């Protein structure tokens, strides 16, 4: 019982669901069903739960391609909790990831421009930062698993990006 997760789980079951049963292999299914039923009701909507705990601000993380229409709707609504977004450009720098060129095409559409060079990529990201800022974003969030370092020149970076856009392999 030294793991705080044990205590947090029981605290949250009691605080949010009025469930005081001990969670174990015998009670798990009953607790699952009870919480599932409550979460499907209007009283347990995300908004209601946030208001119940007196949340003042909630931050989400959004990709630069996100149109932010949900955030715009929340700003116009009567929801009392401030919902802000954080700009999360991870996919724009993960050049070795599957689907990278498709992602860059999506980013180009979101920025209303073609991305054919590294400069274009930087310009598209700047445009999206301005768009996010216009929509109240003041934070940036990065979720990279690892940060690699190689000493590349600017011309090498441009060349690697161009080769990737052309579908050619290049050393990373």
Walk through the language-model features, giving the residues of each:
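Metal-cofactor-binding active-site regions of metalloenzymes
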Residues: 1-172
């Amino acid at each position: 019982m030294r793991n705080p997760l044990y205590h947090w789980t029981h605290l949250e079951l009691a605080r949010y669901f009025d469930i005081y049963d001990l969670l174990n292999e015998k009670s798990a299914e009953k607790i699952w069903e009870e919480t599932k039923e409550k979460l499907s009701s209007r009283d347990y909507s995300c908004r209601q739960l946030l208001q119940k705990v007196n949340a003042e601000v909630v931050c989400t993380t959004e990709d630069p391609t996100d149109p932010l229409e949900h955030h715009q709707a929340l700003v116009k609504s009567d929801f009392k909790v401030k919902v802000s977004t954080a700009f999360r450009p991870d996919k724009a720098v993960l050049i070795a990831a599957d689907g990278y060129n498709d992602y860059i095409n999506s980013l180009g559409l979101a920025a209303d421009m073609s991305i054919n060079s590294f400069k274009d990529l930087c310009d598209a990201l700047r445009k999206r930062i301005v768009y996010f800022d216009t929509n109240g974003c003041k934070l940036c969030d990065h979720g990279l698993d690892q940060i690699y370092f190689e000493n590349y020149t600017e011309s090498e970076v441009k060349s690697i990006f161009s080769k990737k856009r052309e579908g050619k392999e290049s050393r990373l």
